[in-house]
Amino acid sequence: MTNIVFMGTPDFAVPILRQLLDDGYHVAAVVTQPDKPKGRKREPVPPPVKVEAERRGIPVLQPTKIREPEQYEQVLAFAPDLIVTAAFGQILPKALLDAPKYGCINVHASLLPELRGGAPIHYAIWQGKTKTGVTIMYMVERLDAGDMLAQVEVPIAETDTVGTLHDKLSAAGAKLLSETLPLLLEGNIAPVPQDEEKATYAPNIRREQERIDWTQPGEAIYNHIRAFHPWPVTYTTQDGHIWKVWWGEKVPAPRSAPPGTILALEENGIVVATGNETAIRITELQPAGKKRMAVGEFLRGAGSRLAVGMKLGEDHERT
């Protein structure tokens, strides 16, 4: 019996853990991030992987710093023959990487060596790619740089968001792992080194990247909006007030105007000029301190003061 330790944290990792269990593998322990305080009461909320592991009766470890000996030794106590990771969120120490008989493998949501890092799904859409995928590779001390064991492509639809693509890639990763593990354990797979010259990176999203740059082409802004939907959500400003822009669509600009100019106020949309002939019609937004709403509702209320010719995104944030 192969003794497996699974390491993962968010929703992306849950179908992958389920696949291991459904395929009959023995998952001796699950390692995940600590519970995080959320909401107004700041009550601790367990990671999705912890919830699934406890539902299945699997021991759970939640190290704060996996690289510290007293913490990674708790993992080694389970004597793993193989460690499988998926969006765990911490860099593993050499002592863990070297311990399992079959090594440590990672299910990564990109076609490596493209988009190494913590936000490959966001960047795949943001960069306007028409395909991405999942790679299973050996883990090494460098970020997502290990030899590849398997890879599968997943097309990106023009209407995909980070949410929909996340689910497609998670399912594809679970299926690919199911197909790859028997080959790995039987020694019937040949690892392929990554081409370092083709490596690109997808670092974790920063707050300043959420702001829409209206000087960009309309196509790029549309990709930005859907790449940040439903998390962390793009935003713009109007007269110093923040609007979260939950959704928008590409439309031909009715006339020429400086980027960020409101070109039209429609029943269900605010049409905004961009850096080219493709405008963006905002259809769903969330003013600061308010609920998420359709633009039609906004224009009948707080947005009734808006007028064609007003500018978005050029002022300092107040709220």
Swiss-Prot record:
Keywords: Protein biosynthesis, Transferase. InterPro entries: Fmt (IPR005794), Formyl_trans_C (IPR005793), Formyl_trans_C_sf (IPR037022), Formyl_transf_N (IPR002376), Formyl_transf_N_sf (IPR036477), Formyl_transferase-like_C_sf (IPR011034), GART_AS (IPR001555), Met-tRNA-FMT_C (IPR044135). One of its GO terms (molecular function) is methionyl-tRNA formyltransferase activity. The keyword Transferase applies. PROSITE patterns: GART. The keyword Transferase applies. Its EC number is 2.1.2.9. Pfam families: Formyl_trans_C, Formyl_trans_N. (6S)-5,6,7,8-tetrahydrofolate binds at S110, L111, L112, P113. It comes from the Bacteria. It catalyses: L-methionyl-tRNA(fMet) + (6R)-10-formyltetrahydrofolate = N-formyl-L-methionyl-tRNA(fMet) + (6S)-5,6,7,8-tetrahydrofolate + H(+). One of its GO terms (cellular component) is cytosol. PANTHER family: METHIONYL-TRNA FORMYLTRANSFERASE, METHIONYL-TRNA FORMYLTRANSFERASE, MITOCHONDRIAL. Attaches a formyl group to the free amino group of methionyl-tRNA(fMet). The formyl group appears to play a dual role in the initiator identity of N-formylmethionyl-tRNA by promoting its recognition by IF2 and preventing the misappropriation of this tRNA by the elongation apparatus. Belongs to the Fmt family. This is Methionyl-tRNA formyltransferase. It comes from Geobacillus kaustophilus (strain HTA426). The gene is fmt.
